[in-house]
Amino acid sequence: MSTWLLPENIADVLPSEARKIEELRRRLLDRFRSYGYEMVMPPLLEYLESLLTSGGADLRLRTFKLVDQLSGRTLGLRADITPQVARIDAHLLNRQGVTRLCYAGHVMHTRPRGLHATREQIQIGAEIYGHAGLEADLEIQQLMLDALHLAGLSRIRLDLGHAGVLAALLARDAQAAERGESLYDALSGKDVPLLNELTDDLGADTRAALRALPNLYGDASVLAEARTRLPVLPEITRALDDLAQLASQAKGVEVAIDLADLRGYAYHSGAMFSAYIDGVPNAIARGGRYDHVGQAYGRSRPATGFSLDLRELARISPVEARGTAILAPWAQDDALCAAVAALRDAGEVVIQALPGHDHVLDEFACDRSLVERNGAWVVEPR
């Protein structure tokens, strides 16, 4: 076996891609900071039970497992940073008011999520803890869209759903609740024959409501139809009101409502949103409310947030990250060394051409040169 081969769906990040990823990472983290979010850096490795407090069977299957040589306990390589940030908020920070946290780091998946997807993503995201009102969801939605615009993306479609609708329907019908997982699978796959089979012997109101969900999709006007076809329950009314506000505040993007889109249902407790762009089949960013995540760490707090994969964002972003630079000669000259140091201190990229290698590097656009004029080193256009 060749020593240079990597595992399937694992790849090196080469300079051009790395430069773009880093440019986007800095832009997004700076924007998060401008909203008041504080950076945290959870470890890549944790005890397995700490990583799998939420997310259900899917997260368990995606998590690499290994044995700790010190304790003998099972460890996991994180597949999602969100539970780790919830642990930090619940157990370490222990603040009483609103906490805004952000992060950026690698996550590993045992299996790729698509044919050409990587198993090593660079996840970046932001979370708000401590506020149960819709204001927090609106801020997270705005921040997510702001981040995508900052990455140069346009023609964004925002898909909105709400975990509270199905939860309310199951809560009022014990027989339906017993089939919750099967109903979730049928609705998520829009498998109408299976849905009809699962609901045949349910109460008339519950049966009609569940069968209506796959057809309740479209623009924001579908919410009016949902109010006529779904039971008048406080939880459903509140969910539809929340979706109406989220849709109205999503400026400059196309909005789609899908009350049967339940991806992440086991994880989310309220509004759910996903962002798409033309030509990319999968969501480029996902978010929503997950109020119960901190409960496993001894302190349940209202929470909402979003995340995305920086590697995928860099692949589709039109942002140009090829930096400009100053080309300087290599010489043992005190004045030259001082000039180069001063330029670098000022934030300039200065590349000194090593002897015999005077070509301009492809990774930088050397648009200026450092040359000696009348005993002084000056920068001139190339």
UniProtKB/Swiss-Prot annotation:
Main location class: cytoplasm
GO molecular function: histidine-tRNA ligase activity
Pfam families linked to this entry: tRNA-synt_His (PF13393)
Entry-linked InterPro entries: aa-tRNA-synth_II/BPL/LPL, HisRS-like_core, HisRS/HisZ, HisZ
Superkingdom: Bacteria
Gene Ontology CC terms, in alphabetical order: cytoplasm
Pathway: Amino-acid biosynthesis; L-histidine biosynthesis; L-histidine from 5-phospho-alpha-D-ribose 1-diphosphate: step 1/9
Keywords from the UniProt entry: Amino-acid biosynthesis, Cytoplasm, Histidine biosynthesis
Keyword Amino-acid biosynthesis listed: yes
GO terms for biological process, alphabetical: histidyl-tRNA aminoacylation; L-histidine biosynthetic process
Annotated compartments: Cytoplasm
Keyword NAD: no
SUPFAM superfamilies per the UniProt record, alphabetical: Class II aaRS and biotin synthetases
Subunit structure, interactors included: Heteromultimer composed of HisG and HisZ subunits.
PANTHER family tied to this protein: HISTIDINE--TRNA LIGASE, MITOCHONDRIAL-RELATED, HISTIDYL-TRNA SYNTHETASE
Function: Required for the first step of histidine biosynthesis. May allow the feedback regulation of ATP phosphoribosyltransferase activity by histidine.
Miscellaneous comment in the UniProt entry for this protein: This function is generally fulfilled by the C-terminal part of HisG, which is missing in some bacteria such as this one.
Similarity section: Belongs to the class-II aminoacyl-tRNA synthetase family. HisZ subfamily.
Protein name according to UniProt: ATP phosphoribosyltransferase regulatory subunit
Organism per entry: Burkholderia orbicola (strain MC0-3)
Gene name of the encoded protein: hisZ
